[in-house]
């Protein structure tokens, strides 16, 4: 795909992952990128350089507001849809009604993109679509593979259900209308510009302020797939270039890391000796 000839829309474009995606698209030759973000969690400074260079056309707007999705997709060739109501584990567990709004957001934008004859739609999905009942035994060496998502569906809270429904909607549009799309499932993403309420940045921040006892949600045995943001955005662009039929793919690694091991590495690297205090009553998600 010749990105220099494509008009691209990135929703939620001032956020952590999206801003890295824009950097990567620019490096691949993109010269016309429209960004929409309500700045509820994104930061304009993440894309300010591209705005000033004229590559990014920035719109501060709410995609749930009437008419906004239709205006944003007008004249666009490729949509990367990363906008969502989201947060760390505590947020998605404690704000289910807020996360449920993603069902409407995704459906409205997909319909608008199809009606505007967008060439390709790439959706930021999540490991939360995987069945909870498969992930309850930490002693089991489980690798989540794409075909595990199927009946009986058992997504992780309303955030996961919304992501799953968007994936299924895109497959339906591909099957019924020939609408070209792909879904990319993120796991635990880390990297520069990461926000403070996500796991890795929160750990590092607590280490630098010398928190002692050092608090860990759960018992530390939860398994996570830590994935660098640069790998995520390269995967999204490859999906845009190579997948047309709404297929959902994992963007992650096969490296399994316990939360407690990540904590110990952060403490070691920052030179902190601290007592570790487990908080088993706090939200942890699937183990």
Residue ranges and their predicted role:
Residues 165, 169, 173, 203, ...:
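Hydrophobic alpha-helix immediately C-terminal to the catalytic Tyr-X-X-X-Lys motif of short-chain
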């Amino acid at each position: 795909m010749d990105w220099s000839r494509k008009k691209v829309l990135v929703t939620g474009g001032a956020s952590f992952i999206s801003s890295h995606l824009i950097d990567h698209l620019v490096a691949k030759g993109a010269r016309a990128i429209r960004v929409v973000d309500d700045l509820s969690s994104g930061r304009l400074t993440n894309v300010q350089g591209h705005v000033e260079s004229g590559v990014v056309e920035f719109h501060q707007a709410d995609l749930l507001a009437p008419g906004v999705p239709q205006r944003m997709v007008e004249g666009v060739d490729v949509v990367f849809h990363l906008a969502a109501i989201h947060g760390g584990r505590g947020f998605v567990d404690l704000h289910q009604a807020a996360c449920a709004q993603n069902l409407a957001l995704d459906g409205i934008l997909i319909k608008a993109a199809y009606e505007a004859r967008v060439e390709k739609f790439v959706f930021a999905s999540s490991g939360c679509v995987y069945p909870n009942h498969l992930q309850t035994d930490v002693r089991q060496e489980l690798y989540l593979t794409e075909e595990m998502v199927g009946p009986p569906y058992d997504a992780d809270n309303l955030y996961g259900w919304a992501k799953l429904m968007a994936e299924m909607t895109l497959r339906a549009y591909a099957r019924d209308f020939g609408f070209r799309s792909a879904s990319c499932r993120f796991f635990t993403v880390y990297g520069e510009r990461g926000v403070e309420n996500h796991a890795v940045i929160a750990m590092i921040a607590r280490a630098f302020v010398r928190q002692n006892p050092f608090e860990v949600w759960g018992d530390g045995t939860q398994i996570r797939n830590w994935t660098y943001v640069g790998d995520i955005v390269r995967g999204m662009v490859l999906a845009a270039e190579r997948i047309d039929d709404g297929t959902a793919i994992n963007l992650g690694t096969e490296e399994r890391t316990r939360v407690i091991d990540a904590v110990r590495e952060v403490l070691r690297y920052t030179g902190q000796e601290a007592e570790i205090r487990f908080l088993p009553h706090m939200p942890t998600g699937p183990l």
